[in-house]
Amino acid sequence: MNNDFNSWDKYCNYLWFDKQVNIWLDISKINFTLDQISSLENKFKKVFSALKELEAGAISNIDEKRQVGHYWLRNPSVAPSNLIKDAINNEIRDISEFGEKILEGKITNNKNQKFTNVLWIGIGGSGLGPLLITEALQENSCGLNFSYIDNIDPFLISEKLDELSDKLATTLFVVVSKSGGTPEPKIAMNIIKKHVENKNLDWNSNAIAITMKDSQLYKKAQLENWLKIFNLPDWVGGRTSITSSVGLLPLALINRDVSEFIKGAAIMDDLTRIPNIKDNPAALLSSAWFFSGDGIGKRDMVVLPYRDRLQVFSKYLQQLVMESLGKKFNRKGEIVHQGISVFGNKGSTDQHAYVQQLRDGIDNFFCVFIELLDTPNSNFYFDSENPKEFLSGFLQGTRSALSNENRQSITITLDKLSCLTLGALIALFERAVSFYAELVDINAYDQPGVEAGKKAAAEIIDYQKQVTEIFNNGEELSIKEITSLLRNSSAEPIFFIIRQMCFGNDDYLINGDWSKPSTIRIKKIS
């Protein structure tokens, strides 16, 4: 490593720890010097100032002209108005009380049966956040059993409904959509609702909406008298919604401490308000990202949690980091193509997979190791073999092997996985994302690429409807002929539509060779 410290001195100088959350952060295996850290001090003055403005209620999502307030959720006292503060406190209290009543059987289905299961319908952060909560924190036989619909793959929907076939009557159906108009959860909800009603079961008394007030979903849930509606404010984005009702309701329904989760995030938020790089964990973490990628994101982030319960954390960070930081333009309107690609799974599994390339292949990444110090109540041994010690040995061995090849890494250590430490860990990465965005002068809170993808998908869906109507005329047509009948279309997406619609479908007569799309002619015969 090119730095002006020897390894031990650098480790001691830059190891961060806080006893409120018992989390350590080590960035010593990132290639930087003291002078480089010092060179960021002026930038960080602007970073700290920008975050203060954001928390005070500045319009930070310029595209949607809205505030960004997920930090208020864990400390309502910093919210810019008493109205918001009271709404947050009331929502937290409502969720906790609702969860208790569900688990105690004080709230039941329309046949007075206790709820046993949850089918959670949500995409992106609306699905990943709850999945992380339940995978990381649910204990055996505690609370309700969760299943997730985070896609409109028909096989996934069929599989989940089959799994719940004899439990549908006692399943809570939670639909999460801020606008209520996002196609995937809306389509999944309609399919599942129809399936439930076809079984002569009552959807409305089992259904919960998490949405923005007066959204399409809000109005539907209110009109149909659903069991419950929880608020998802317009100032909370999907990828930062885990400390809103989106993450707190799952906590309550698996009988975990909602207040401890919020407390962990609030403590970390406070720690990351310290206006000093070395004393601020988010400043250290974002600096490490900045130095490892030369400020232009030239290295990917490989997340390796050494605990199976945190396997989903890699996917969670993938959305949080990539959707926030993957931007074509900076705030000046200059093309910068910023971003950090994130992938990962878990240790020590990945030591038998892609760690080979990380050590000996292209040097285009930095690792984030996540270590835990606790053990189960029942210690598992075989002779003198302790799995915890082996897992720790694998982590340290991989970290050392990478370091010996000048491959960079960050190590985060938690004393245990709890509501408090998970809340703090999530908040640490949220704050680091905000800090990094300020360092490179991009907006972390818009997502023009996602919106462009949604718009393009909507156009294709419209073409699908038009193609279906064209075939109703009974003519035999080629791909080019179909394309010519559609405004502003091109042949390739039309071929994709035709293949999806017609291949293996006896309602259509296909002449031609599927390997030669220009020869294909299609006619609807029934």
Curated annotation (Swiss-Prot):
Per the record, the pathway is: Carbohydrate biosynthesis; gluconeogenesis; Carbohydrate degradation; glycolysis; D-glyceraldehyde 3-phosphate and glycerone phosphate from D-glucose: step 2/4
Q: Can you say where in the cell this protein is located?
A: Cytoplasm
Residues annotated as the enzyme's active site: 323 (proton donor), 352, 454
What Pfam families is this protein classified in?
A: PGI (PF00342)
Listed GO CC annotations: cytosol
Instruction: Spell out the reaction equation it catalyses.
Output: alpha-D-glucose 6-phosphate = beta-D-fructose 6-phosphate
Annotated GO biological processes are: gluconeogenesis; glucose 6-phosphate metabolic process; glycolytic process
Q: Which SUPFAM superfamilies match?
A: SIS domain (SSF53697)
> What Gene Ontology molecular function terms does this protein carry?
carbohydrate derivative binding; glucose-6-phosphate isomerase activity; monosaccharide binding
The record lists its disulfide bonds as: none
Q: Which InterPro entries match?
A: G6P_Isomerase, Phosphoglucose_isomerase_CS, SIS_dom_sf, SIS_PGI_1, SIS_PGI_2
Q: What is its EC number?
A: 5.3.1.9
Q: Keywords for this entry?
A: Cytoplasm, Gluconeogenesis, Glycolysis, Isomerase
Coarse class of the primary localization is cytoplasm
Which domain of life does this protein belong to? Bacteria
- Report the family membership: Belongs to the GPI family.
Q: Which NCBIfam families match?
A: PRK14096.1
List the PANTHER family: GLUCOSE-6-PHOSPHATE ISOMERASE
Which HAMAP family does this UniProt record tie to the protein?
G6P_isomerase (MF_00473)
User: Any idea what job this protein has?
Assistant: Catalyzes the reversible isomerization of glucose-6-phosphate to fructose-6-phosphate.
| Protein name (database record) | Glucose-6-phosphate isomerase
Q: Which classification does the entry list for the species?
A: Bacteria, Bacillati, Cyanobacteriota, Cyanophyceae, Synechococcales
Q: Which gene encodes it?
A: pgi
